[in-house]
Amino acid sequence: MIVTFISQCEKKAIPRTRRVLDAFADRIGDNTWQTVITEDGLVAVKNLLRKTASKNTAVSCHRIATRRRTELVWIVGNRSKFNHKGIVPVNFTTKELFMDLPLETKTILANTHGQPLSQHLFAVGYLAHQIIEHLKIDNNNIAQSAFIAGILHDIGKLDPQFQQWLSKKLDKSDENIILPEDGVHIDTSIRGFKDFSFEDHPRHNEISWLLAESLLANSKNPQINQIFHGIYWHHTRPYRKDDKFFNKAEGIDKKFKNSLTEITLEKVTDQLVAVLNDIQRIGKNFKNDEFNFENLAPKWSYTYQLTKNDLPNYKIYNDLSEKISEFVSDIQPNALNNLVRMAVISADRVVSVMSAEDLNEYLIEGTLHHALDNILQDNTQLSNHIRLCIDGFKQKYPDSERNIIQTKAALELANLKENAEFDESSNVAVLQGPAGCGKTKIALEWALRTDVQKIIWVCPRVQVCLGLLHDLTEADYLPNSRIEIFTGEYKKILQNGVTFDTAPETQTNEYFTGDIIITTIDQVINNIISHQKVTGMIDFMQAHVVFDEFHELIPMPAFNLFFAELIEAKKMKKHLANTLLVSATPHDYFVENILKIDSG
């Protein structure tokens, strides 16, 4: 472990303490030491300090627990020189500190990590907004919708039954808390809450949607439906034996109100107002050129009123649709829903794994955006590897007409990015060519010329994936890149001459980490339709994407619509869409009339 020692010793205790600590650690300041040490070594240091301790001795030891947090291990000597966390007091104030939450809301919690609900809601809303911004989605309304959905996604946790259950859950929980994949909900692990499980009581996301409908009753936001969809569907909808109370607002409202025994609806409303005021106060600390809470937050309608709107459908395609134009008109709204939901769930997961202390520090320091460092795309060596590949072909076949034609095609495709930026259109292109013409090499050179960091190569069938994997790992192509195959049956990463047969199965935490990920359309669609994998859509939105043999997707019911949603989402990145549709026989009607792409 890495530890830091702080000395607040006085008089003769100073040299005695220094002799001990100098023997075990590096002095990094007049009164500070740091070292890597074992548990046994740390015990030895403590015992030696105790042997020489006097009333003037005061030494604290802190362990570096995480990248952002240290923990007090022990104090030897005069404990009054430090506070209970081992911090040296230097001043005091009678003013309210920025993150001192009012008494009425500081005990309203979001999860078993003890995060205050106000802080949790703001953090999720802020990070959801930042995700949309980082993905370069050219739609300010989407970023605002993600923010509003984020700050309201768990507002239903004001439910008194949830707060009572959570309080008792925290009393009996150990320190190593693992949050469930589908969030924290009332369950029967605590005695006395059987009547408030999901079978008989609304889940917090259902109550959140109900309250949000009331809060935004007067909103003029043109994308209000994306907000409600993101709130309601940030958790999966549970299967209930009797769903009659939970498939409409009136039933959820009735179940919720009937559960209010000791606390009135007016009291819940007062708490809601207080939490939203907290969120506004926190938001002022994050004001900058890209984020202004006052411009993003709507005008709330605080008087509770039961909505007459239906619950948000997961997909809004109409069962009665018969004309192609009817389906096409629903593609963009579904794509918008996907993006808002992706941002809210991803932000929620990032925030929920933090300790309450870490979250509080992020908010005090105004550095919450750094929490996204692990999910945003890193720079890779892929472009260098592709350049070596292309140069190798030119050196091996210096006067090859085939190479010249392929480079010309790649250059024409790459130039579409500049044209799209000038025209403010989307950089989604179609590459048509007969089998054996080198479409794979053209696609790689196109990626190189458009600043590639990662490629997600989507195939209609596993057999196509395996063929592509074989080609890309050949010595002439990208033997040193991390080429990942990710299908239902095969999950491997090949690099530096490792063969398919000898490569081990990819560990779960390594999924989608390759420089090039070869996968099937069903795996990519899972990023849309499943709650567990929706955060993988962030990878999809950041990467260069190649849809290989995409014409095979068009006759597949449902898949063709999901495919269209994916393309629509990428188109929202405008010239940064970096998406290529590859086929020997592209379906011109589908491309032009469904995907709305100029196939020329």
Listing of model-derived features with the role each one plays in the protein:
Residues 1-92, 129, 212-392:
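N-terminal accessory nucleic-acid engagement/regulatory domains that precede
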Residues 110-148, 158, 166-167, 171, ...:
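Alpha-helical phosphate/pyrophosphate-handling elements in metalloenzyme active cores
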Residues 143-144, 423, 507-514, 530-543:
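Short basic/glycine-enriched coil/helix segment immediately N-terminal to the Walker B
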Residues 344, 478-529:
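Inter-Walker segment of RecA-like/P-loop motor cores
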Residues 389-430:
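Conserved pre-motif I regulatory segment
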Residues 422-447, 582-583:
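Walker A/P-loop
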Residues 442, 447-477, 483-491, 585-590:
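Conserved Walker A/P-loop ATP-binding site and its immediately adjacent core
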Residues 453, 535-544, 549-600:
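Post-DEXD/H (motif II) to motif III coupling segment of the RecA-like Helicase ATP-binding lobe
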